[in-house]
Design a protein with these regions (language model features):
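Catalytic domains of cell-wall/extracellular-matrix polysaccharide-remodeling enzymes
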Residues: 1-122
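C-terminal accessory extensions appended to soluble enzyme cores
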Residues: 117-136
Length: 136
């Protein structure tokens, strides 16, 4: 557990040095996290309600269709911004989803916009109460 905390702290230090802000949110690799980790790490675990599988199929059309299919009220959609085809698919999907009435928000805004206070040690996957908002 100490190694995991040390790795997270090192990464957070780098991000804080570059941005001036310490990250509070973490997506565990592959979504794998256990209750001990949830309760011993000082961060909010943000997972996802659906995935574009862009790590598996690097095709813009496939990713675009997954975004359009999975965009639902309160959804958190997993994507990887290091893939050019994913960025292209997102840029294509955003205007269409906005026309459908969706708003794009930061994941912490999505999870707290109904007055809920985020809790450490809880793996968040979506916001079941929200209407018309989605986070990527």
């Amino acid at each position: 557990m100490a190694d995991i905390k040390e790795d997270i702290d090192k990464g957070a230090d780098v991000i804080e040095t570059i941005t001036g802000e310490r990250p509070l949110f973490l997506r565990a690799p592959y979504g794998n996290v256990n209750f001990i980790q949830l309760n011993q790490l000082d961060c909010f675990f943000i997972h996802w309600s659906s995935s574009t599988y862009d790590w598996f199929r690097e095709e813009e059309e496939y990713i675009y269709k997954r975004i359009m299919k999975e965009a639902k009220d309160g959804a958190i959609i997993l994507m990887h911004d290091t893939r050019e085809v994913t960025v292209k698919a997102v840029l294509r999907a955003i205007p269409e989803l906005q026309e459908q009435g969706y708003e794009f928000v930061r994941v912490d805004d999505l999870l707290s916009r109904n007055g809920d206070k985020l809790k450490m040690g809880v793996p968040y996957r979506s916001c079941k109460y929200d209407r018309g908002a989605v986070a990527f």
